[in-house]
Amino acid sequence: MAKQIVFNEEARRALERGVNALAESVRVTLGPKGRNVVLDKKFGAPLITNDGVTIAREIELEDPFENMGAQLVKEVATKTNDVAGDGTTTATVLAQAIIREGLKNVAAGANPMGIKRGIEKAVESVVEDIKTNAKPIESKESIAQVASISAGDDNIGVLISDAMEKVGKDGVITVEEAKGMTTELKVVEGMQFDRGYLSAYMITDTDKMEAILNDPYILITDKKIGAIADILPVLEKVVQAGRQLLIIAEDIEGEALATLILNKLRGTFTCVAVKAPGFGDRRKAMLEDIAILTGGTVITEDLGLKLENTTIDMLGRARQIRVTKEETTIVEGSGSQDDIKSRVEAIKKQIDETTSDFDREKLQERLAKLAGGVAVIQVGAATEVEMKEKKLRIEDALAATRAAVEEGIVAGGGCALVDAAKALDSLKLTGDEKTGVAIVCRALEEPLRQIANNAGFEGSIVVEKVRNGGRGVGFNALTEAYEDMIAAGIVDPAKVTRSALQNAASIAAMLLTTECLVSDIPSKDNGAAAMAGMGGMGGMGGMM
């Protein structure tokens, strides 16, 4: 297919127009007084949001060269979202500022490669300053502050800090849509997996339709159990001990299942059977997790163990087990804390090494189930449109909170970036590299400038006042006052601020060094074909 090619200034200007189209759509959402953007959806109601990456993902431009610029800045937002989970609007604003200032200098005759080197050195210096001045996050109040600033809602901040307190920093916190109007937190203690009882005859509480086993033994195997003879020896030992039993197996069917139900109905013996969670290798790993948590052994031929030779000390134990139609929860397993700790460390290592997002998510779920539990934030709202908008804000706040726990917090409201610009004074560079540093220095003011503009203030005046104030003193757009940002609870995660700058500078520096754009020539056949079709319809009308 034939291509169209543009060079030099024409190419860079086309990219800049695309960058501006996307960035202008996103930057209006920045800060506590930022506005929302409405995104049209082909199916269902439009989506109202102030989430930078969600807006960026929707933008496609008609002109192929302008679209290249928009897609490059979209990469800044998505990469920041992947790494830090928040700060996507800040990253977009920074990228636009670096590109705008950089292109001015390139047009004036500066060497783009020299500017690129200067930008890289400046970013390195600023990132070092952010890391040095980051404060570790310890208290529940600090966690609530980070979440509140990200979500723009104090109630959400409290909800997330409660969730983190209950399940720990390694715990899983999921966000779901609720059926009612209230947003609430539900915490699942212990290990839960999505497999329920194999027969309703196994329930012990008919009102709640669930089976509750107190201080039971747990038989864990990866085999199918069909014949009662396979498990009879261990059943007899459990009955003699006067205890209840939970069986977790690949499947239990036929004679074995019928016998267990019959004994339950006669009141001889209480046993609940559930299928093993997961599939394939993941199932084996989850069964091992359950065994370690409960102090049992997985009866598997991989270890040379057979069901008929199972002894009572191979069974796991727990304080209580709750089994519903859909899920099983093991509360307070009797496993050794040292074994659980070792298993947690092994899973953490796997999380660091894996390259698959899906595997990482599943490993984090396993880690949470071993380390603390799972918290579910159920998002309620009056309408579906409001619920989706709220859910996006909570997901961002959650990501920001995790980032804060990881690398600490810095002054919020764009203040940390303005303060970090002072670190650039120590860089003694010359020529175009010095210009690159000046470009970054100007770009670092842009988030604060935009927050002030969105709040109805003159950005340049606000930036000047903050620059001349002490470190950590910034502009609170909500109260319209200048104050110590950390003391006022206006904080950003250091990881979010750092990632936003690094990703913005990376894409912007590459874009400045662009000299040529190549794209397919847009096809004109589609319009001609449509016109021909219309003519045919007219001919048919004459025949009627």
Curated annotation (Swiss-Prot):
Its EC number is 5.6.1.7. CDD domains: GroEL (cd03344). It holds the Pfam family Cpn60_TCP1. The keyword ATP-binding applies. GO terms for cellular component: cytoplasm. Signal peptide: none annotated. It is found in: Cytoplasm. The keyword Chaperone applies. GO terms for molecular function: ATP binding; ATP-dependent protein folding chaperone; isomerase activity; unfolded protein binding. Keywords: ATP-binding, Chaperone, Cytoplasm, Isomerase, Nucleotide-binding. It catalyses: ATP + H2O + a folded polypeptide = ADP + phosphate + an unfolded polypeptide. It is an enzyme of class 5 (isomerase). GO terms for biological process: protein refolding. It comes from the Bacteria. ATP binds at T29, L30, G31, P32, D86, G87, T88, T89, T90, G413, N476, A477, L478, D492. Belongs to the chaperonin (HSP60) family. Forms a cylinder of 14 subunits composed of two heptameric rings stacked back-to-back. Interacts with the co-chaperonin GroES. NCBIfam families: GroEL (TIGR02348), PRK00013.1 (NF000592), PRK12849.1 (NF009487), PRK12850.1 (NF009488), PRK12851.1 (NF009489). HAMAP family: CH60. Together with its co-chaperonin GroES, plays an essential role in assisting protein folding. The GroEL-GroES system forms a nano-cage that allows encapsulation of the non-native substrate proteins and provides a physical environment optimized to promote and accelerate protein folding. This is Chaperonin GroEL. It comes from Desulfitobacterium hafniense (strain DSM 10664 / DCB-2). The gene is groEL.
